[in-house]
Amino acid sequence: MSHEKSESCLQEKKHSSSFERFHDGTSLENNLLQNLKLSSQRVLEIAQKKGRSKCPKCNSSRMFYCYTCFVPVESVPSDEIPVVKLPLKIDIIKHPNETDGKSTAVHAKLLAHEDVTVYTYPCVPQYQDQKHEVVLVFPGPDSVSLSDSLLYIRGSGDMQNDSSCEPSLKRPKCSQQYDKSKNEGVEEKKPMHFLKKLIFIDSTWNQTNKIISDERLQGLQQVELMERKTCFWRHQKGTPNTYLSTIEAIYYFMIDYHTIILQKDYKGEYDDLLFFFSFMYRIINDAKKSAGKL
């Protein structure tokens, strides 16, 4: 996703108040990092003082984590890094020219490693047999809101279940059946159970066209996150501040899914997705203040 920043993000506070103000539409960028419920970042503070450290896999010198091996460096014990369990699987398709060290896709893999897979384009999975359970989170002329995508997901699921549901090598056999005749006049409380996987594109915006136009992604419903403003510190000129970094897009989608689809109160379950992001933001923001740039 794009590399964008907000000019007025405030510093994050550990273990602070709930995330209620995220949905009131006011001062969104001001509230993001100060309202997170994060695990202790003491391990990152210690690592910062030590400086760069070796990757345990490739021996490269890195700060905090290795962005090519997707593991913490030796100075950051892996058991002190939070693990976030996501309700959906995530595929991240990264542009080959995307600078690994500038990408936030690695944050998702580090913090939710069981639920996140990163592919480097042109390596793209086949999704044609999974259209009824996959959405592409990407803004565009055909993108819809998360709520509106319910109609597409349900419709595709109905058509899939009406046909012979034979197992294939690419997709496990159908485990859920949806009998529309039995549900006429009955409101579906959780119709998004069809949704199993999200696709995110990790790229600067001027490089996304090649990936988004790939035939393997055609026919997938696109979902756009509305009214969210980025706090990413790498501003890409000419794009609106609603164009989010990859980790921000994943984070916001999970909150929307949790509150809109699962209809549960959000209590910070996914805040640790911004564990590295918020800490790095604070470092960069402090450096800008010291240099008189803020």
UniProtKB/Swiss-Prot annotation:
InterPro entries: DTW, tRNA_Mod/Golgi_Maint. It comes from the Eukaryota. SMART domains: DTW (SM01144). GO terms for biological process: tRNA modification. It is an enzyme of class 2 (transferase). One of its GO terms (cellular component) is nucleus. A motif (DXTW) lies at residues 202-205. Keywords: Nucleus, S-adenosyl-L-methionine, Transferase, tRNA processing. GO terms for molecular function: tRNA-uridine aminocarboxypropyltransferase activity. Residues 158-185 are annotated as: Disordered. Belongs to the TDD superfamily. DTWD1 family. This is tRNA-uridine aminocarboxypropyltransferase 1. The gene is dtwd1.
